[in-house]
C-alpha cells in the first residue's frame, strides 16, 4: 500500500490544489516607476481568472494659500480635543454635496442661446415706444398729459366741461350695460378724484389744456407757443415728434393757466390755417 501511495501521479496534487485555492496576488515594481499587480479570482463557471493591472502613480502638486494650509493643520481643542480628525456632525455643518453632471453638447447649447438672443434682438429692433395717451415716443407713465386727457380711441373718457361720464351706474355701483366686476373704490363715484389741497392751480391746469390736431409736420413748438400766447399765458406746449425723422406727428397739446383763455383760444384757433393745413382745436379729455 505504501508503494502505491508513493507512486501517485504528480498531477493529482496539482489538480487538487488548483481546484480549491487561488494563487497569491503579486505586485512588481517596474523600472519606469509603474507597478504590475497580478490577481486571481473565480468566475461564474468556477474557473480561475487571472487579472493583470499596470498602474502608473502620478503626483499632483496643488498650490494653496499658506494660511489655509496652516489652519487645516491645527489641532482640535476644548470639548472636541479628543475627537477624530475631520468634521464632526455635532459641531460642524457640512454643505450640500452638489453633483456636477457635465454635458457633451454644451457647445451646441451655447450656440442656441446666442441665436435666440440674436433673434429676439432682431424682432425688437423695429419696435418703438408709443404712449397710449398722446402717441408720443415715450412711456405712458411718463406722459406729461396723463392726468389731463384720456387715452386715444377710448369712448369712456370723462369730458372736462362735464366733469363726469354720461354712462349711468346700476345698483351696487356696476355699469348699467355691463356685468363685469367693478372694484369697490371705483363704485358710486369712487373713481372721481378728490379735491386737491392748496388749490386751484392744479385744477386750472387740468381744465385748460387744448388738443390741437392736423398740425403740419414742419411745425415747431415755439411757433405754436407764439400763436396761442396771444390769448393768454401758456404754461406748457407739447408737440409730438418722430424720434427718427424729427418731424411732427400731426398733433400737439397746449396748456393755459386760465380756462377762460383756453376757451378763447379754442374758439379763435379752431379752423385756423397754419402751414397750408386747417387746425382742429378742442379741449383735451380728462382721463378716468
From Swiss-Prot:
Region feature (Disordered): 1-33
PROSITE patterns documented for this protein: RRM
Example GO BP: formation of cytoplasmic translation initiation complex
Pfam families, A to Z: eIF3g, RRM_1
GO cellular component assignments: eukaryotic 43S preinitiation complex; eukaryotic 48S preinitiation complex; eukaryotic translation initiation factor 3 complex
Coiled coil feature spans: none
Major location category of this protein: cytoplasm
Subcellular location: Cytoplasm
Biased segments, Acidic residues type: 11-20
SMART domains: RRM
Comp. bias (Polar residues): 21-33
Key words of the record: Cytoplasm, Initiation factor, Protein biosynthesis, RNA-binding
InterPro entries with a match to the protein in the record: eIF3_g, eIF3g_N, eIF3G_RRM, Nucleotide-bd_a/b_plait_sf, RBD_domain_sf, RRM_dom
GO molecular function, one term: RNA binding
Annotated ranges, domain RRM: 208-286
Assembly and interaction partners: Component of the eukaryotic translation initiation factor 3 (eIF-3) complex.
Function: RNA-binding component of the eukaryotic translation initiation factor 3 (eIF-3) complex, which is involved in protein synthesis of a specialized repertoire of mRNAs and, together with other initiation factors, stimulates binding of mRNA and methionyl-tRNAi to the 40S ribosome. The eIF-3 complex specifically targets and initiates translation of a subset of mRNAs involved in cell proliferation. This subunit can bind 18S rRNA.
Family affiliation: Belongs to the eIF-3 subunit G family.
Name recorded for this polypeptide: Eukaryotic translation initiation factor 3 subunit G
Gene name linked to the record: tif35
